[in-house]
């Protein structure tokens, strides 16, 4: 059974990441079962400090027993995912070259992804049947409110 450890920056991601990863895995391979370890929540402001991301990546690797992958999912806020992502990935890989690691940075906020997917969520969990995405979901601040 494949193992995955996730590192996230916010409370919303702690709850959502295991569910989203399982749903994506199910869509790709209905027979796949993942062993998703408890999510590590570390604020982005701490993870950007030299040595902290590396420490948390090593902790995540130990949670997988050294056999699995690591997903790092963070809000990029006012940064640029295309610029910040490769540097964070480089640092993460330098901490644990023996495991596959992915860094995913949400432009502004992770929750904006749900705004972008509004049409696919219509009529679910009490959402309006005519729900529409805002013109530019990634510019919305406070998307979870």
List where the protein language model places each region.
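C-terminal accessory helical subdomains adjacent to catalytic cores in phosphodiester-
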Residues: 1-4, 12-145
